C-alpha cells in the first residue's frame, strides 16, 4: 500500500488472475504500465480503463460499447463498437509517448515466394478440401485452406534454407502445427541445432554457433529477448499487428 508499481503490459490483458491482481494493486498505489504495443482492439484497454476508474467493471464496458454478432452462437463474437469517440478520448488521456533513440536500426526485408496457383483457384472455384477430400463447410475453413496451400509451398521452404545458409543463428516464427512439421523437416545442416517453443514444448534457446529456434506466435511473441542473433524469419504472418510488433521486438532491444 502507498507504493509505486511499474507493470509490464504483457500480463495485463484479458481477465485472468494477473488482471485481478492488477486491479487490487492499483486501488491503493501509484503505478505506470509500460507497453510497446498498447492494444489491437478496444477490449485490450479494458483492464487499464477500469483501473483508471472510467468503468466499474468489464460488464459495464461491454454494456456501453460492445455489440455482439447475432449469427455466432457457439461463442460471443464482437460485431462492432459503440461510442468510439469516447474510447478515443479515454485512450488519449492515458497514453504517454516515450521518445528515444536506438543505437541500432531495424531492417525489414520482404522475401517473395511462389504458390500453386492452379490448386489455389481450384479451392476458390470448387470449395473443396484437397487434404481431406471433402467439401469445405465454413468460411473459416476456406480461408485456412487457402493459407495452408500458400504457406506449405516448397519455394517458401527453399527461401528459409537460403536465409539460414547466410545467417547461422535465426529465430523463425510460425502460426500452425503443420508449419512446425514443415520447419522441423527442413535440412538446415548437420551442425545446426533446432529447438522449439510452442504449446507442446518450451526448449531453451540453443547455445551453439549454428541454430534455428522455432517459435509459435501465441507462445513466444512476448516476454523474452535474445541478443545472440540479429535475424528473425516470419515463416507466416500473424493476423495481429500487436503480435507482429512484439515478435519483431524479441531481438530489437536497447543492448542489441
Locations of regions flagged by a protein language model:
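Inter-Walker segment of RecA-like/P-loop motor cores
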Residues: 1
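Conserved P-loop NTPase motor "coupling/switch" region that bridges the ATPase
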Residues: 4, 21-102, 256
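Hydrophobic residues in beta-strands of the RecA-like P-loop NTPase core, especially within AAA+ ATPase
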Residues: 7-8, 248
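A short beta-strand-to-loop transition that corresponds to the Sensor-1 phosphate-sensing loop
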Residues: 9, 34-38, 174-176, 215-218
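Conserved ATPase-coupling elements of RecA-like P-loop NTPase cores
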Residues: 10-22
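Conserved RecA-like P-loop NTPase helicase motor core
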Residues: 193-256
